[in-house]
Amino acid sequence: MAFEPKEPQKELKYNELRIYSDEELHNYTEEELKNFKIKHNVPMCDDLESGPWPSFVADAKREALHRRKLGKEKLMIERDVVEDLLGQLERSFEHGETHWKHGGIVGVFGYGGGVIGRYSDLQEEFPSIAHFHTMRVNQPASKFYNSDYLRTLCDLWEYRGSGMMNFHGSTGDIIFLGTFTEQLEPIFYELTHVLQQDLGGSGSNLRTPSCCIGKARCEWACYDTQDMCYEMTYHYQDELHRPAFPYKFKFKFDGCPNCCVASIARADMSFIGTWRDNIRIDQKAVQAYIGGEIIPNAGAHRGRDWGKFDIDKEVIDLCPTKCMWMEGGKLMIDDKECTRCMHCINVMPQALWPGKETGVSILVGAKAPILEGAQMSLLTIPFMKAEYPYDNIKNNVIEPIWEWWMEEGKNRERLGELIQRQGIQKLIQILNIPAMPQMVKEPRSNPYIFWKSEDVPGGFKRDIKDYRSRHKR
């Protein structure tokens, strides 16, 4: 089925929207850059330009020179913003502490997220960054861009912001680094009305959903990651723009177990493509790999001579559940023991494919260290069909978990920490699902078993008021 956007789309033409001419965009020479000095003395920042790696300081100096030559009449905030930024960074290196402070909540009308307020506590020394707010822009699914869009975006931020951007933040957003409060509403208007792009999430809300390239270009995608990401973004607009959660919540959509957006490590709820039937095998292609007729790993490791392909060492022995073996010249797989790691498929992509009955595995609880340590996602739903409009997932998984988390979660407590605190048993109860071996971390050490009346033949009744009338505290 062809993709149908929820809103009418228009084609952007940079030449109709551009703010700067080609001469203004390319307004300095490499010789000028070599001789350029910013207005602050920043020896430690300068030192970061040395060495073999690309330097953000070198990039910042290019932008500083570009803005200085553009002049104030072509910019809506101070032209020295990047120079002052490097100056304050040098002070932070000298003092061993940050010089950004929180001075209150800033944002755009109607939204509780999308803007991260940032103010300098050295405003007299660095007035151009007295305000230096960050804006998060909701990226297109799978980060597909064309040149007209990117150039228009860059012109807008050059004109109304610092000109510095980050492609992309760890959640996936386009990051606009540094502008003044007065520019937030005009930028938001241009983004939404001209570029048809929304702000992303920030604060204690649903963060911008992010997905891999999916069926657009990847043969292994087991569901349409872009469609699901788009639908969840639209369906949960209120949760994305108006913070109501105990803390942040992230969706990430991986089309297959290769996990190209690392959802298993970075998302409160990970959707990883999988299959529930058997891996498909082309035995002739298996023999072609063994005989050296087909290069393993699709040629990805051709940088050196690894010797003749050995299916035992490179595939069978590396299977985490040891569910593969050769028998009579054929590759055999015990699919009920397969853990869907994709290793064998990655090594022999012309011989093995995922099954035909595809869907998603849903995992919950990954996070970085906040209240507790970092942790990976917990497999919660081994298989679920993922088909538009995804009501089975919304109604049976997402919303029951949110209801529990918003009721029971402490301030700044991620979902994974709530599960740590209240136990996996509570999660199982909320979702009304059976326990699985994957949920067992270690043998139990608590000698007591707490039975529910429905678990005991004949049941039992317990009147706590009657008990307390006879046994005072």
Question: Which ranges hold each PLM region?
Answer:
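Iron-sulfur cluster-binding cysteine motifs and their immediate structural context
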Residues: 268, 311-333, 337-361
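A hydrophobic, small-residue-rich beta->alpha segment in the mid-to-C-terminal subdomain
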Residues: 360, 366-409
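Charge-rich, low-complexity segments
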Residues: 2-121
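A glycine-rich phosphate-binding loop feature that marks nucleotide/adenosyl-phosphate handling sites
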Residues: 209-212, 249-258, 415-428, 448
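C-terminal, charged low-complexity interaction regions
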Residues: 426-473
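Flexible, glycine/charged-enriched surface loops at secondary-structure junctions
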Residues: 102, 162-169, 201-203, 242-248, ...
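Small-residue-enriched alpha-helical segments and adjacent helix-cap loops
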Residues: 2-22, 28, 103-111, 133-299, ...
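Short glycine-/aliphatic-rich beta-strand segments at the starts of folded cytosolic domains
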Residues: 85-145, 208-216, 379-383
